[in-house]
């Protein structure tokens, strides 16, 4: 009963002395500058501030380890985080990053319990209270308060990817140059005919169906009208092509200067949009229906090549008697050069006096007797004839598929089944 229990104050003093001894021991090992200070002075500073500030190490030998504003710099001058390997050049960014480790959220909303470590997050949150929506979609009336929501809306609603227009135009020109370099290869031209989707085609119909051609041209792409305008001016003015192409945009000029092999690939797909032989073509009330008459297709030649002679058909009121042609090219080989007769478009026998006489050069055109297509180039003609079978002209020479007629044969290649 005579023993006295130690007072709590004595226990706190003993624990503080123990902490001071451990602190001095650590400072001696690390060579810190704080070791020069007395333990009493250190305890006084801790008592006044209530916080233990980290030591500021100054290394004069290694400049990469110097501390600026309490942050260590790396060898390339960036500020390094003391908790991880993150480094940045901006002090404000590093302070925001350190708040991830410390959990500090100094930016608080005065209307609700929301708090954030980033000021920009608080600004976006305040728009939910004010109702402000500064970000608007340029394709619809959608508005939002955050830019990330607008990006999500564009991807989900309009299927738009974050791609710049300048880069897409550059990649288009690069792809065009590659196609022009590879266009000299015969095998590559065949692959273009089979695989590429057609952008446009020049179409020539009888005069009885000219009023229906206007409805067909509305469905063509914009650059198809450029080709049509250049083709119509061939027989009138040699400079018509240059003026027609010069009036278009830069992208239209690139399409007009494309390789002729690329233009050949446009033929198969456009044939699919033309009615089959079983369906009667629409005619005007005052014109006669010609069941044996077929439209004539012409594959355009590039602008740099000599201008092709325009092919004009007689008016629908005058019947057309085509010259007899063999049903199959018996003397032709699919892989050999020109082997079909070079013919010209027949003119009407009893045409009206005001009808212009067709002007054409048989040496410029190569005719396919099966598909009724005229080619201004021997290479284009050879590639096309190589797709026909030897025994059966409507049998695919690549996969052996048998087609019923020229329409079915063109649709077979338009499906793009050959890889």
Curated annotation (Swiss-Prot):
Similarity field: Belongs to the Ikaros C2H2-type zinc-finger protein family.
What are the GO cellular component annotations? nucleus
InterPro entries hit by this protein: Ikaros_C2H2-ZF, Znf_C2H2_sf, Znf_C2H2_type
- Tell me what this protein is called: Zinc finger protein Pegasus
Q: Which keywords appear in this protein's UniProt record, sorted alphabetically?
A: DNA-binding, Metal-binding, Nucleus, Repeat, Repressor, Transcription, Transcription regulation, Zinc, Zinc-finger
Presence of keyword Transmembrane: no
How does this protein assemble? Answer: Probably self-associates.
Q: What else is known?
A: 'Pegasus' was the winged horse in Greek mythology.
Which stretches does UniProt call biased (Polar residues)? 310-320, 341-360
Question: Could you tell me what this protein does?
Answer: Transcriptional repressor that binds the core 5'GNNTGTNG-3' DNA consensus sequence.
Q: Which parts of this protein are zinc fingers (C2H2-type)?
A: 79-101, 107-129, 135-158, 366-388, 394-418
Q: Which domain of life is it from?
A: Eukaryota
- List every stretch annotated Disordered: 203-255, 310-360
Q: Where in the cell is it found?
A: Nucleus
GO terms (molecular function) for this protein are: chromatin binding; DNA-binding transcription factor activity; RNA polymerase II cis-regulatory region sequence-specific DNA binding; zinc ion binding
Where mainly found?
nucleus
Biological process terms in GO annotation: determination of intestine left/right asymmetry; determination of left/right asymmetry in lateral mesoderm; determination of left/right symmetry; determination of pancreatic left/right asymmetry; regulation of transcription by RNA polymerase II
Residue ranges with Basic and acidic residues bias: 208-228
């Amino acid at each position: 009963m005579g023993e006295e229990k130690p007072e709590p104050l004595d226990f706190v003093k003993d624990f503080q002395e123990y902490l001071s001894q451990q602190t001095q021991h650590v400072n001696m090992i690390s060579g810190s500058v704080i070791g020069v200070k007395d333990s009493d002075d250190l305890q006084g500073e801790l008592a006044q501030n209530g916080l233990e500030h980290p030591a500021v190490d100054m290394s004069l030998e290694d400049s990469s380890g110097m501390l600026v504003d309490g942050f260590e710099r790396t060898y390339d001058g960036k500020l390094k985080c003391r908790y991880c390997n993150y480094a940045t050049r901006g002090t404000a960014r590093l302070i925001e990053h350190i708040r991830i480790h410390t959990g500090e959220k100094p930016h608080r909303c005065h209307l609700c319990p929301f708090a954030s470590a980033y000021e920009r997050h608080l600004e976006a949150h305040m728009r939910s209270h004010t109702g402000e929506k500064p970000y608007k979609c340029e394709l619809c009336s959608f508005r939002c308060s955050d830019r990330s929501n607008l990006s999500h809306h564009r991807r989900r609603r309009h299927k738009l990817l974050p791609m710049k227009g300048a880069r897409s135009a550059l990649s288009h020109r690069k792809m065009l140059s590659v196609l022009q370099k590879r266009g000299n290869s015969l095998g590559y031209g065949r692959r273009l005919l089979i695989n590429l989707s057609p952008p446009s085609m020049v179409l020539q119909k009888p005069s009885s169906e000219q009023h229906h051609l206007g409805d067909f041209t509305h469905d063509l792409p914009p650059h198809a009208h450029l080709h049509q305008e250049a083709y119509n001016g061939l027989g009138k003015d040699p400079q018509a092509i240059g003026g027609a192409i010069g009036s278009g945009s830069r992208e239209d000029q690139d399409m007009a200067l494309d390789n002729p092999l690329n233009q050949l690939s446009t033929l198969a797909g456009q044939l699919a949009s033309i009615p089959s032989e079983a369906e009667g073509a629409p005619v005007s009330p005052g014109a006669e229906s010609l069941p044996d008459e077929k439209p004539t297709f012409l594959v355009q030649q590039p602008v740099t090549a000599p201008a092709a002679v325009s092919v004009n058909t007689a008016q629908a009121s005058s019947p057309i008697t085509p010259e007899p042609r063999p049903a199959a090219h018996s003397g032709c080989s699919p892989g050999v050069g020109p082997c079909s007769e070079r013919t010209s478009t027949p003119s009407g026998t009893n045409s009206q006096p005001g009808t212009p006489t067709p002007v054409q050069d048989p040496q410029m055109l190569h005719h396919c007797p099966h598909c009724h297509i005229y080619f201004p180039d021997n290479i284009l003609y050879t590639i096309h004839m190589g797709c026909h079978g030897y025994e059966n002209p409507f049998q695919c020479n690549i996969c052996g598929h048998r087609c019923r007629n020229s329409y079915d044969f063109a649709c077979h290649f338009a499906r793009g089944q050959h890889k």
